Amino acid sequence: MSKQKIIIRDISWLSFNSRVLQEAADDTVPLRERMRFLGIFSNNLDEFFRVRVATLNRMIAIGQKKNMHLEMNPSLILEEIQEKVLEQQKEFERIWNEILRELKKQKIFLVNENKLNRIQQRFVQDYFNEEIRSNVVPLMMESIREFPTLSDKSIYLACTLSKKDKSIAKKFALVSVPARRLPRFIILPSKQNEKHIILLEDVIRFCLPHIFSFFGYDSFSSAIIKVTRDAEIDIDNDVSTSLIQKIEKGLKNRKKGKTVRFVYDKEIDASLLAYLVKRLGLSHKDNLIPGGRIHNFKDFIDFPESVFVKKNPRKKPFLHPALKNVSRTTDIILQKDILLNFPYHSFDTVIDLLREAAIDPEVVSIKITCYRLASRSKIINALTNAVRNGKQVTAVLELRARFDEEANLEWKEELEEAGVKVIIGVPEMKVHAKFCLIKKIVQNKIILYGFVSTGNINEQTAKIYGDHCLLTANKNIMADVSRIFHYLELPKMRPHFLKACKTIMVSPAAMRKQLMQLIQKEITAAKAKKTASITLKLNSLSDELLIEKLYEAAKAGVVINMIVRGIFCMLTENLKFKEVYAISIVDEYLEHARVMIFHNGGKEKVFISSADWMVRNIDHRIEAACPVFEKNIQQELKDILQIQLNDNIKARILDNELSNQYVNPRNTKKIRSQLETYNYLHKKSI
């Protein structure tokens, strides 16, 4: 494909993060939600530097571009990233200052160490002595030969100690802010009807004279700094070590990964900045980014809600109508398929299904894939209870789920101690598909049932992620799920099991080929002047071969509607592509579902999937796209996607210029798809 025919993946991702920033800028969004979006933006950007920028740096270091699916030279991509990130940083600061003004209108004040009254000063000093002092160990930078490795999840106060009469030479010190052990936000004693909040680092700033009292200085200044490190885990080819040992080694090495970004308060003492850059071995190529006074904004996702007079609680999830007044979820699933739509439907149904299986005397085994689990997972509880009740339980645990590796290693130990058979994935491929297979024997007859999901089996993320979960006892679907588990148990000996799947599209075995065939069928229909359409709901679209096929379909006249939240590399604005409509929706819930609908000559084919249309998902992961057979569920998915395509409040047009222009309501009824979807599903449940 000509490189001019797609948008650069990393630049497209930055455009997505700009949409998150738009939500923070939107004054119709509740104030606490606006702060949450600033936190999400910050967290997203941290991960982007840890992963994508780090990867580009690696490629430059080894002079590699070939076969890495890049649209242009990595050095040029990095230059464009730097330019856009600096633009976003300025917009971030503007929005933050606007939010601070709005907070003041609500009598909420984020105060620093210089704005405290006497009562607050005493409170802060006492709080420091009682809660913080024992967690603070300052480092005198000139006194240490080997500079410490700065954690990329921490923030640090870089301090300048000086004497007003200049009788003592100034010194530099470093204080780690213990925000992972202590609350970042501290509510201060305040006047009636006012709320004053101070940040943990500002409490430490206030107490710098006490921390450094024995050095004889009387003037102290400080600035927040932060580093971001390469988060890639290198898994070597040493056959003498297990995958677990390699991951454990990789996690240790990650803490010392190469610095890919250094962010600092732009008001920092110039000599201190120069000293830090030198001691850290940085250069201007290492993304030195000036920022504001506050860093690690991701903590603002959890800004205390109690300070707001007006609360904006999320709508509570509700029970699927088919499960109302039902004593056992299992009985209904054995009769018909049920589609759970999170976060609107309650995730408790999934937990109930596993709990029922754990105590059902007819159930003999449970198999499940686990990618990211909740911190206090009820799924794990159900699985361990099943073992206690004599069931054979198998959990496929993906140890390489990025940033969840340590948690999954801990889950592995807990599950194995309980007697669960743990499979730690497939060599060289992540298991990203989400399945559960429950086997019961009734009157010597084997019955298989379970679920296929677009998202993680995680009760925490199910409250804020938009996903679909198909509960089913369909024999064809469950036969394929069984085949996939057979493969996962012995991947090197059973590769034929993936290829044997008859209803589920599985990557890397056949998904690419099958998707190409489905698109080609629409192309053939369009060329024959027949109705032809494709509707896609994805997180990301960057696979060049699939994009090329979509271009071919668009040229042939296939109507293509796309809802893509994140990366979108397809160019849509072309006179020959009149039938292409692409939007991105960013709102209160994270749109995480993947759905594909092909007209198929009037016999529509509808799939829910764990896979985005990216090379990594199609060729290098275990992924699954599951067909939806029942007409009422097909219609429900079509209705939900149509509601989203009609969104004119939170939808942005995905255009060639990455402008993120909102869809124009044009005096029609205002449609906010997440609210409309809630109403649509809730009405069904009444």
Protein language model annotation of sequence segments:
Residues 1-534, 552, 556, 568-686:
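N-terminal localization/anchoring segments of enzymes in phospholipid and broader phosphate metabolism
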Residues 544-547, 551:
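Glycine/threonine-rich ATP-lid/beta-loop region of ATP-binding domains
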Residues 559-563:
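Hydrophobic alpha/beta core scaffold segments
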